[in-house]
Amino acid sequence: MQSVVFVTGNANKLREVQDIVGNALPMLTCHQLDLPELQGTTQTVSIHKAKTAAAILKTPVLIEDTSLGFVALNGLPGPYIKWFMESVGHVGLNAMLHGFDDKSAFALCTFAYCEPGHDPILFEGRTDGLIVHPRGPAGFGWDPIFQPCGFTTTYAEMDKDLKNSISHRYKALALVKEFFQSKSDLALHS
């Protein structure tokens, strides 16, 4: 099976994907590509990024887009979480929910696989949780303020293996792995 290029410039994201998928994907290589970010839903952004990357690189690509939605704010900041983090940080994100009793949130991860000239295939994983005051190391985005439902720790406080077995990214990648396994099975029977 042909190799797949994972388009990211985020070393933490690449490491986490590799930790989760192991060798389940066909020869996953990495390439940083500065892609224009559309405004829209995570799905719209993912489709556009995947089509653009596949056309530029002329090879199958896998891209990922993550959003963090606050229920009290109808899903904001959503796919704009990266810019909110850069602008206001953990404290500012918490302040956005000041005055709201509802601190519930959801983390959504969308992977898009695209071959040149084809429509992307989307894979989504979602984890519900709460927005809390920052706890744990601040090394990976909004992990210190997101506490998944059923846990008393934030993503940042969790052991890496635990986080990688319950996260929104894990759930989406489980679907990606399933897709590539079925693709591999079809190739074996052809």
Curated annotation (Swiss-Prot):
Domain of life: Eukaryota
Free-text remark on how the cofactor is bound: Binds 1 divalent metal cation per subunit; can use either Mg(2+) or Mn(2+).
Enzyme class: hydrolase
Alphabetized Pfam families for the sequence: Ham1p_like
Entries under NCBIfam families matching the protein: RdgB/HAM1 family non-canonical purine NTP pyrophosphatase
Designated name of the protein: Inosine triphosphate pyrophosphatase
High-level lineage: Eukaryota, Fungi, Fungi incertae sedis, Chytridiomycota, Chytridiomycota incertae sedis
Species in which this protein is naturally found: Batrachochytrium dendrobatidis (strain JAM81 / FGSC 10211)
Catalytic activity: ITP + H2O = IMP + diphosphate + H(+); dITP + H2O = dIMP + diphosphate + H(+); XTP + H2O = XMP + diphosphate + H(+)
